[in-house]
Amino acid sequence: MFFVLSISAQSENEAIKNIMTRTSIRKYTDQPVSKADIETLLRAGMAAPTAVNKQPWHFVAVTDKAKLKELSGGRGGMLEQCALAIVVCGNMEKTMQGKGQEFWIQDCSAATENILLAAHALGLGAVWTGGYPMEERVASISKALKLPETIIPLCTIVIGHPAERPTPKDKWKPENVSYNEFGGK
């Protein structure tokens, strides 16, 4: 038996509503993100589940405009117009200790999604941009942030006050779901 919230129940549940209405925002105003909001975003990231509670992450919050430009690699765009970027990194010293060594990407991805949802809940816009495993991006981000070899950038979350409000898309596709076994209805 599967429990599914009706559409009306979904719209009344704030957590579900936040998930269903989050969209990628790529255009931002000049307004800075407050230190309190930055800490809230980082706390949300650190609240993510991790394999064997390893918490194998390190976050770099970037607000300096020159550093944001350097992170953009001279390509301009989102990183140069945003107020904040949070680079989510895996800490290999933590990752390689004990059990759960293979799970740092999943753990840091869960933290990334928490930050994206927290940004939306705070009225901020955000978009997830990839880093790892693209060697050129990893090297560029690592150089810009002076990361030690044991800290690997997974992704950069570009964040700011939205200058656009795209309509959320309903991405539900029942053909992408099976029950009990592949192809099960």
Say what each PLM segment does.
Residues 1-6:
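Bacterial N-terminal signal peptides
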Residues 7-185:
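Acidic, surface-exposed loops and disordered segments
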